Amino acid sequence: MKKVLIVDNSSYMRMFVKKILEKEGAYTILEASGKDDAMDIFMSQNPAIVILDLNMSETTMEGLEVLTDIMKINSNAVVIIISAVRHEEVQEQCIELGAKGYIKKPIDAKVLLKVLEEYK
């Protein structure tokens, strides 16, 4: 089973994504609520896929920092962004930094699973 790290400051959102993935039965789920936890888990557990929220603090798009740090460690990492940010420039920036996908909130389970299917 592939390890998937879900990174979101919202416990509700982590639970929601976790439930979607658990129904598939193909993933071991890891969770982090912020940048430091995310990087510790990424370094120690080496997840196959990271599902990453951009806005994990009120003042910054901390997810961009996490994405950048992950790509410095492993430029082939599969990072899927989930975010309520709809600005095309932000989406383009995430892809340029190495994200493999960008899913807008509210998350549609079918869309998430379709994106993940590409990396099974």
Give short role names for the model-derived ranges:
Residues 89, 107-116:
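C-terminal output helix
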Residues 55-57:
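The short loop immediately C-terminal to the conserved phospho-acceptor aspartate in CheY-like receiver
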Residues 31-49:
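Acidic, metal-coordinating helix/loop segments flanking the phosphotransfer/catalytic sites
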Residues 61, 86-101:
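Alpha4 helix (beta4-alpha4-beta5 surface) of REC/receiver domains from two-component response regulators
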Residues 11-30:
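Two-component/phosphorelay signaling modules centered on CheY-like receiver
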Residues 40, 62-75:
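Short amphipathic alpha-helix used as the core "switch/output" element in two-component signaling
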